[in-house]
Every structure is written in C-alpha cells, then in structure tokens.
C-alpha cells in the first residue's frame, strides 16, 4: 500500500481476495477436536496449544516413585577415597535420569556387607509405602556378601528371575511382590552393567506403566568387525553417524568392559 500525500488517497497495487487477512473462528481448532491422544508425553508445543485454547487443567499420570540402594563396603560417596574403595557413580547416574524418564528418586544410602537385617527391615517398611520400584546396585552376583537375592526371596513374590544371557548385565534380578504393584530390580555393581540394565529393563518397565509407545530399534551398517559369544545378547557402546546420502553407520567403540566409562561419554 502506498499513501499519496499530495492527492490524499491510497494506491493499492494488487488485488485483495475476499476475506484475506481475516481470522475466522474455528479455522485452527474446531469444536471437539482431539488435541492429543491418551498416553502422549506432554511437551512445550502441547502447552502452547492448551494455553491458546484456555485449557487450565488436564489429567496426567503420576510419576513413578523409585527408591535406590547401593551395596558393598567398597562403595563410597566421597571424592577422596583409599585405593580399595569405589566412588558411587551408579546412584548419581540413575538420579540424573529422573526428569528424562518421569520418575521421582529417593536414595536410601549404602548397604554394608553385613546389613542383611537392615535391608530386610527397610524393604518391609517400603512395601507399605507409595513406592513403585525398588532398585539395588551391586550385591546380586555370587560373592560371599551378595545377600540381596536371599533377602528378596523372603517376601511373597509373584514373579522372580535372576541372571540373563546378556552382556553387560548378566547378574540382573527382577522380583514382583505378590498382590502389590511393586517391583524390585537388582542391578549389577559395575557402572556399564548397571547403566545397561537400567536402560533396557527399568526404563521399558516405566514406559509400560505410563502407557507410552514401545520404542522401535534403529538399524544401520556396522563399520567395524565385532565378535560376540552366540549365547549372549550383547549391548555395545557405539557411535552412530549419518552419511551424506542418509545412510546410518554404526561404529563399535573401544573399551567395552563393564567397568570402563570413558567410551560412554
């Protein structure tokens, strides 16, 4: 549009279509439109739509409540430790995931090698609470002080398994308390074993409770050779890249041992 100050009129240099630049009621959202499906994970885009439409309250599922125990005299929360001690990375790693995977996290400290009675009493109390998942780290293998499985079996269970053909993470334990919506995951103590079991057992369990869509695997071309034992399912730390023509390539990284963290960064 151009305004001519001399002749005091506006020169329109193009034709207008009827109703151009007019916003009609219902042109964006219509009455009874479904905004989001049930079990959808709400993101900032949904919040924008809710506020635009004046939606003040929505029904959501409660976050899962997780209680966490570490175990072993060798585990320490201190930064400065003697040579026989290990810093407690598993507790902090899992806690850091609570916002990503919709759970509340409470740490109940480190169980010492002779804390069988203490662990039993704690479990007995927790099973009366609103806790959904109990996680232990370490103490599930076949060592002298690995008492976690023995204590768990003292409770009435509807489901139980221990040890899977998986690396890292072979010693994992799972138990469901009979007549209660409460489960126990016993994770191995090595950092990568613990991380793998949390990722491929605990997170899918949480997603299932919340009604989230099942994950689909991504397939790609392996760039380097990798040998594994046939009887084991193997999870390997890898680097995924996309080529210029859109192909997915996967590189298996060095340092696959379950105690090595560097290649996980």
Show which residues each predicted segment covers.
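Solvent-exposed alpha-helices and their adjacent loops that cap or buttress functional pockets
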Residues: 4-5, 27-29, 42, 57-62, ...
């Amino acid at each position: 549009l151009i305004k001519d100050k001399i002749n005091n009129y506006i020169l329109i240099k193009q034709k207008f279509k009827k109703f151009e630049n007019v916003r009609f009621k219902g042109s964006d959202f219509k009455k009874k439109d479904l905004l989001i499906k049930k079990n959808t994970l709400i993101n900032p885009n949904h919040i924008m739509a809710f506020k635009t439409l004046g939606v003040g309250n929505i029904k959501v599922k409660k976050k899962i409540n997780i209680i966490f125990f570490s175990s072993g005299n060798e585990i320490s929360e201190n930064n400065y430790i003697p040579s026989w001690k290990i810093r407690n990375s598993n507790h902090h790693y899992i806690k850091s995931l609570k916002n990503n995977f919709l759970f509340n996290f409470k740490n109940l400290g480190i169980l010492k090698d002779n804390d069988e009675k203490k662990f039993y009493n704690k479990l007995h109390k927790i099973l009366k609470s609103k806790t959904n998942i109990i996680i232990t780290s370490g103490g599930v293998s076949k060592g002298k002080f690995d008492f976690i499985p023995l204590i768990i079996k003292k409770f009435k269970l509807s489901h139980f398994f221990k040890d899977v053909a998986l690396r890292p993470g072979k010693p994992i334990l799972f138990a469901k308390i009979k007549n209660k919506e409460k489960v126990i995951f016993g994770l191995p103590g090595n950092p990568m074993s613990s991380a793998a079991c949390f990722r491929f057992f605990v997170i899918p369990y949480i997603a299932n409770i919340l009604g989230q869509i099942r994950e689909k695997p991504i397939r790609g071309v392996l760039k380097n050779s990798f040998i594994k034992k046939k009887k084991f399912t193997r999870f390997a730390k890898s680097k995924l890249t996309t080529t210029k023509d859109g192909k997915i390539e996967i590189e298996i990284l060095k340092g696959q041992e379950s105690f090595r963290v560097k290649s996980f960064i």
